[in-house]
C-alpha cells in the first residue's frame, strides 16, 4: 500500500493478539541523525527472479490505475480506471505475491515469500531486488518516494532508507512487546510526504523510546536527519503541498505538523485509518458510530472540518482519484474477534463532488496511481 502504504497489512498481522489501550503523549524536537551506511543502494540493485506480474496489454501513459481485486476473482490485478464506466484489467500478479504497490505508472513492487522487496516493470524485462528483510514483527512494511527513486522499509526493529546514497539504518527502535491490540487505536504508518522531502513513521507498537528512538518520527528524506519526534500518537496521514502531517492522540483534536509552524491543533475528529486524496485537498477515514459499526468521513484540508460522511456500515476508505473514494460495506458481528464488524461482501464508490454512492466491482484496493497530483494546497 501507500501511503500508508502498508499500514493495513502490518496491523492485520497483529490483530490476532487482542485489544488494549495506548501510551500517553510526550514530545521531542531535537534533530538526531542516526543513520549508518548499508550495502544495497537503490541506484544499483541486485538482479531479481522472474517477474510475478504479467501484462496482456500496454499500460496507457497517464491513466489512473489501481492494484486490487475484482468481485468474483481473487487474482490481484493492475486495472485501468481512467474511464470508471469502462475499467479494464491490464496485468495480473501471481498468487504468491505479497503487498504489491506502484513504484511509478510503469513499474510495481511486491514482496516474496523469501522476504525480498522486488521491483518489476509493467512492460516486462528483468526484475530487481531492492532490499531483503528478516522475519519478525513489522518487518517488510515499505513505501516509495513520489518519484520512485527512494525506498523506506522496516526490518524488525530497524528503520531503513534506500537511496542513491546507499542503504542506511535511520534508527533502531525498541522491540515491540507482546500485548493486545485495539483495532481502532493501534496503527503503523510509514510514508514519504507528497513532496518527497520527508518520511514519517508513526506507530503504536515500538514504544518506550524518545528522540531518535521515539515511536512517532518525521525525518528528512535527503539525509535521514530527525526533524520531529513525539509519542502517544496514532492514525497519521500526509496531506497538501507543501506537505503537512496530520495525526491524533487517544483524545483531543487532530494535530498538524509542518516544517515551518510545528504542531497546530485542528478539528476534533477521532478518525481511523486516514488516507489523503492525490491533490492533498481531502482526507478520508473510518469513524466509529453509536451502532458499533463504522461510517466513512471526509475532511476538507482547507476548511479544517468534516465536510460529509456516509451512512453507518462503511469502512476501509481509499481514494481512487481526487473525487472518487472506494470503501467496503460492513455489519455488526457479535461472534467475531473482539466484537469487530465484518464485511458484507459489497463495496462502494463515493463521489465527493456529487455526494453520491454506487456499488463497485472492485472487491479490494491495495494501491492507486497517481498518488500525487496538482493542484494541492
Please state what every model-predicted region is.
Residues 1-10:
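Bacterial N-terminal signal peptides that target proteins for export
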Residues 16-19:
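C-terminal motif of bacterial Sec signal peptides marking the signal peptidase cleavage site
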Residues 21-29:
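Bacterial lipoprotein signal-peptidase II cleavage site
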Residues 35-377:
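Sequence signature of WD/YWTD-type beta-propeller architectures
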